[in-house]
Amino acid sequence: MKKMIIHGGKRLSGELTIGGAKNSTVALIPAAILADTPVQFDTVPHILDVHNLRLILESMNVHSTFENDVLTIDPTNIEESELPSHAIKSLRASYYFMGALLGRFNRATVTFPGGDNIGPRPIDQHIKGFKALGANVVEENDSVFISTGTEGLHGARIFLDVVSVGATINIILAAVKAHGTTTIENAAKEPEIIDLATFLNNMGAKIRGAGTDVIRIEGVPALHSRATHTIIPDRIETGTYLSLAASIGDGILLKNVIPEHMESFTAKLVEMGVDLQINEDSIYVPRSNDLDPIRVKTMTYPGFATDLQQPITPLLLRANGSSVVIDTIYPQRTQHVEQLRKMGADIRVQDNLIVVGHSSHLQGAHVEAGEIRSGAALMIAGLAASGVTEISRADNILRGYDRVIDKLHTLGADVEIAADEEVPEN
């Protein structure tokens, strides 16, 4: 494992460019195996999840190259094979291979995926969707075996009991080549779902309604890539750096941003008193001084993203009063709380609420990044704190943030990644 070493306590300034969306990328890469031609993606983030997904592709004889932010994937000689468990178990989004393999081969075997430990994220809605499409699903030990009869998959009406990004994407992947029309009701509306649908439609798929709560998929026999697909900017990375800029910035410009995707987040910053300058594809954050406390409640898109409730926490510590965070999506997403307390933060969990008090002075400490977004919160806090902060399990941060060390260096941060001898590899 790796650790992040931060010499904090100084103001940062400059500009940086937001990378492609992680949550799009981890769906688009499995989707590529549905194509009958090579496919190409641009603005691909340099994150560990991409590396692990490429390992999974290689195990199926799907070759890929990754140069200058461009990822080329050639699925024309794909072979069914057992997917590498070490790569599957390291990232949650590997479950998208269930839908993609089902769409390609009418069968799939996938080990239960890993990823962040932030409480239960069941796949029952995925299974419900596959069964509605005509698949037989068997769960055994830590694996899922999915198969169809000789008729293959067929269109169906599927009502999701809960709004689920993962289930919406997996059903799209399975249904895009199925016979007939599939309707997903109570579908997730995230921009990453629109991005996936755009990619598939440009290859000949017939998907309507992405971005609304009703998505209709008319199955097609084949998909052929015609052009490079540019991945949308990462709204979670954007929000993380907005929080950093408002916390410890002395004027920071974020480029390659879609402001419409950030409205629930930027509205909260404005409510705090941050003087954002929002342009067509960039956001400038001047130095922020007196900040008001706020109440944050996570919701499905277009509400406040659960992935941003931890990264905004270091900013809430600067507010003149107590802020409250309610995570309705993953109430157990509180790993950052105890770690921030080690740095002197006035923060606690109380009756499923996170109460964040004014903390004028954070002190560097040894802390642990239990998952991606708690790691981002600790990173911002470490940059704000006086002294040295060491974040163990920093691989979790590298999993989700594109070239994070390089970007922090461009802002003037004193930060580095080093081997962590005390934490063994998984």
Swiss-Prot record:
* Cell compartment(s), UniProt: Cytoplasm
Which InterPro entries is this protein grouped with?
Answer: Enolpyruvate_Tfrase_dom (IPR001986), Enolpyruvate_Tfrase_sf (IPR036968), MurA_subfamily (IPR050068), RNA3'P_cycl/enolpyr_Trfase_a/b (IPR013792), UDP_GlcNAc_COvinyl_MurA (IPR005750)
| Encoding gene, per UniProt annotation | murA2
Q: Which family does it belong to?
A: Belongs to the EPSP synthase family. MurA subfamily.
A Pfam family that the UniProt record links to this protein = EPSP_synthase
Q: What does this protein do?
A: Cell wall formation. Adds enolpyruvyl to UDP-N-acetylglucosamine.
Q: What's the catalysed reaction?
A: phosphoenolpyruvate + UDP-N-acetyl-alpha-D-glucosamine = UDP-N-acetyl-3-O-(1-carboxyvinyl)-alpha-D-glucosamine + phosphate
Residues that, per the record, bind phosphoenolpyruvate: 22-23
Q: Where does UDP-N-acetyl-alpha-D-glucosamine bind?
A: 92, 121-125, 307, 329
Species assigned in the record: Lactiplantibacillus plantarum (strain ATCC BAA-793 / NCIMB 8826 / WCFS1)
Please state the span of the N-terminal signal peptide per the UniProt entry. none
Q: Which GO terms describe its biological process?
A: cell division; cell wall organization; peptidoglycan biosynthetic process; regulation of cell shape; UDP-N-acetylgalactosamine biosynthetic process
**Gene Ontology cellular-component terms listed:** cytoplasm
**Could you tell me the EC number(s) of this protein?**
2.5.1.7
Q: Which residues are annotated as active site?
A: 116 (proton donor)
Q: What name is this protein filed under?
A: UDP-N-acetylglucosamine 1-carboxyvinyltransferase 2
Principal localization?
Answer: cytoplasm
Q: In which pathway does it act?
A: Cell wall biogenesis; peptidoglycan biosynthesis
Its organism's taxonomic lineage begins at:
Bacteria, Bacillati, Bacillota, Bacilli, Lactobacillales
Keyword RNA-binding carried by entry? no
Molecular function terms, GO-annotated: UDP-N-acetylglucosamine 1-carboxyvinyltransferase activity
Q: Which UniProt keywords apply?
A: Cell cycle, Cell division, Cell shape, Cell wall biogenesis/degradation, Cytoplasm, Peptidoglycan synthesis, Transferase
